[in-house]
């Protein structure tokens, strides 16, 4: 009976570990795939690792991650060790209370810590601005900067803050094992408190310090949520970069970088566990030795550490930190521009080309939706220079005074923008924007899975596709296609019509029509044949069709849809306005527009690029561009005539959208 129970327990344990590590093992295996598929093995290759180390954005995030982790670990280890010693000197009741307080940040949700730190920095920056203005007004010898933004410094402070509790937790037990009489004896023999600390206390607690430091370094390497809220626009950690890369599809390059991150954390944890096991074995051996045996052996001769080894180790560590500082920040000491856009919404070679031509360093970050961008800006966590929101969000930002008027004399390529994309409703006087891309929202469907052609939004509510339909995770688009199905305008301000559309979504959700809400996760779902129907953007459909053998099709439904324009804007009081306008002018050029159209499959508003793209494609690939593909990329006027552009809705209607969307998530 006991043997059967033991076997059963082992099987359960094996299955648990298999379930836990099988996905990671699969990720590691496909990081060596010669092709770009995550399901079909095409041969062994280290190609993706080579690509990884040649990617400027990834390597910059690696440097930032390692640097912030090293600095945060060093500072937190020093501060946490002295804090632990301070706890140790207190009375037991007080010490227990403080230890409980110390444990709270480790048990607290990272999202709470991240948002709290973000709000703290925003409040401090507002206070600093008022203080600097007052201080500068009463004297002229020292001028304090009035504008502070989230940057590498705030990221470092955040990492130090969440690392210190781990140091205290690791050092505390070693201090409690320490015989207090040793410290008293050392001080009776003439040691100062500091000498007693370094000669007596430090050697005893060193194992705890090392374990705490390794844990802190691991936590910093692995952190995403707190970094996301405190890094600002100029610093991006490796975890943030991976998150941005996964917004489209999981490529073998992402597998490669995830593998390296997993191996790094695994090695650090192994070092921690091996060291702790070694220290426990030493402690047990010491306990086995009797006092008589120790006395019989006589005084143990300890090998004095070579001072040159200490100096060399310190110098090596200093060189590593300095090298990383120079690597990460050497380029940003000059002119920079901080850009925020959507995932895979630019040909990254254009970033390199712009930097080469202008000497301006580009810090490029991504966000998943207009609403996420707005929330980030309102929270004060997005100190960008250039953003690329959609039309309706631009209108909202203008109304709230969050955008800066452009100096179009610095943007001569604005003259290349087709007249159809000037003086639109979101910027009727062309003061704030330069159009970046345009396109339509429609239905993407798998022809084999649906067994025919789709022409209407009613397919999004059809029971025959239950469990195979992806609902776009965007309140305007999701409620928008429901409104169109009912024959209403996308921009209706009638609450009853909006609620009627909402009830359609709720009913379909309860009937199991929707597989789930998605944004860029749609790429993996549709390309892998894991869903039949989805609502998404025409340019992304073309990207999917180009990367899969699944028979995907796209349609702008007969009821009409949304046609959108994403435009480049400069945020109010942007610190690098001249650089921002230089970036906008470069991206609006015909050369950049053609390269970008070919990479992201979205049409450019540049009239020369629109006219030249079919011949550009044929010259580049040696075959003509399919007219049907071009009609999806740059839809003809008859398609646009049955579509609407979003406009910014009144505040009470936006609040209604938000409330209904939250209710839909609950339902």
How would you name each of these model-derived features?
Residues 12, 17-24, 108, 161, ...:
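Transmembrane alpha-helices
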Residues 3-5, 49-57, 221-278:
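Interhelical loop and adjacent transmembrane-helix boundary motif
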Residues 1-6, 71-102, 115-123, 128, ...:
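Transmembrane-helix boundary motif in ABC transporter permease subunits
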Residues 15, 22-56, 228-233, 281:
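Short membrane-interfacial helix/loop motifs at transmembrane-helix boundaries
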Residues 37, 46, 94, 111-160, ...:
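Membrane-interfacial helix termini and adjacent extracytoplasmic/periplasmic loops
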Residues 328-397, 524:
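Early extracytoplasmic/lumenal segment of secretory-pathway proteins
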Residues 3-11, 172-183, 187, 197-199, ...:
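C-terminal transmembrane helix and the adjacent membrane-cytosol boundary/short C-terminal tail
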Residues 189-190, 203, 437, 441:
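Glycine/proline-centered hinge or cleavage motifs at structural transition points of membrane proteins
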């Amino acid at each position: 009976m006991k043997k059967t129970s033991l076997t059963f327990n082992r099987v359960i344990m094996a299955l648990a570990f298999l379930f836990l590590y099988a996905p990671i093992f699969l990720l590691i295996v496909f990081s060596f795939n010669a092709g770009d598929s995550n399901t079909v093995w095409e041969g062994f290759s280290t190609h993706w690792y080579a690509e990884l180390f040649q990617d400027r954005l990834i390597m910059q995030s690696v440097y930032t991650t390692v640097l912030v982790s090293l600095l945060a670990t060093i500072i937190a280890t020093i501060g946490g060790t002295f804090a632990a010693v301070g706890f140790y000197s207190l009375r037991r009741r007080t010490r227990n209370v403080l230890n409980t307080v110390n444990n709270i940040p480790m048990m607290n949700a990272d999202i709470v810590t991240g948002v709290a730190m973000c709000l703290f920095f925003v409040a401090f920056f507002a206070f600093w601005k008022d203080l600097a203005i007052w201080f500068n007004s009463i004297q002229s010898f020292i001028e304090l900067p009035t504008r502070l933004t989230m940057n590498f410094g705030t990221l470092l402070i955040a990492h130090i803050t969440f690392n210190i509790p781990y140091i205290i937790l690791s050092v505390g037990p070693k201090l409690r094992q320490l015989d207090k009489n040793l410290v008293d004896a050392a001080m009776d023999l003439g040691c100062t408190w500091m000498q007693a600390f370094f000669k007596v206390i430090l050697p005893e607690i060193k194992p705890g310090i090392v374990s705490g430091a390794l844990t802190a370094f691991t936590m910093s390497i692995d952190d995403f949520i707190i970094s996301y809220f405190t890094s600002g626009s100029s610093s991006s950690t490796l975890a943030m970069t991976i998150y941005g890369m996964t917004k489209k599809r999981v490529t073998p390059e992402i597998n490669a970088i995830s593998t390296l991150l997993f191996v790094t954390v695994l090695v650090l944890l192994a070092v921690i566990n091996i060291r702790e096991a070694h220290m426990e074995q030493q402690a047990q051996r010491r306990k086995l030795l009797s006092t008589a045996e120790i006395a019989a052996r006589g005084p143990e001769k300890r090998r004095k550490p070579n001072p040159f080894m200490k100096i060399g180790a310190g110098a090596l560590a200093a060189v590593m930190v300095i090298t990383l500082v120079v690597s990460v920040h050497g380029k940003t000491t000059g002119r920079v521009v901080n850009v925020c856009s959507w995932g895979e919404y630019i040909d990254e070679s254009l970033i390199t080309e712009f930097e080469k031509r202008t000497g301006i360093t580009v810090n490029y970050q991504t966000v998943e939706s207009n609403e996420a961008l707005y929330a980030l800006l309102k929270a004060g966590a997005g100190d960008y220079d250039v953003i690329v929101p959609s039309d309706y969000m631009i209108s909202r930002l203008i109304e709230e005074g969050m955008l800066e008027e452009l100096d179009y004399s610095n943007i001569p390529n604005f003259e290349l923008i087709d007249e159809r994309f000037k003086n639109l409703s979101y910027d009727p006087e062309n003061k704030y924007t330069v159009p970046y891309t345009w396109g339509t929202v429609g239905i993407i469907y798998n022809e084999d899975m649906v067994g025919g052609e789709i022409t209407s939004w009613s397919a999004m509510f059809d029971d025959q596709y239950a469990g195979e339909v992806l609902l776009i995770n965007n309140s305007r688009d999701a409620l928008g296609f429901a409104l169109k199905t009912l024959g209403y305008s996308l921009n209706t301000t009638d609450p009853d019509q909006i609620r009627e559309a909402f009830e359609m979504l709720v009913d379909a959700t309860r009937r199991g029509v929707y597989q789930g809400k998605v944004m860029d996760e749609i790429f993996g779902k549709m390309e892998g044949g894991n869903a039949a129907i989805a609502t998404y953007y025409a340019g992304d459909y073309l990207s999917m069709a180009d990367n899969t053998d699944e028979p995907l099709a796209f349609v702008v439904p007969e009821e009409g849809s949304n046609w959108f324009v994403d435009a480049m804007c400069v945020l109010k009081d942007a610190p690098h306005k001249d650089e921002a306008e230089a970036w906008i002018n470069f991206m609006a050029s015909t050369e950049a527009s053609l390269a970008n159209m070919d990479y992201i499959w979205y049409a450019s508003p540049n009239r020369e690029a629109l006219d030249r793209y079919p011949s550009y494609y044929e010259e580049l690939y040696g075959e003509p561009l399919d007219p049907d593909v071009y009609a999806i990329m740059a839809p003809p006027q008859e398609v646009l005539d049955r579509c609407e552009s979003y406009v910014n809705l009144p505040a009470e209607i936006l609040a209604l959208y938000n409330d209904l969307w939250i209710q839909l998530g609950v339902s």
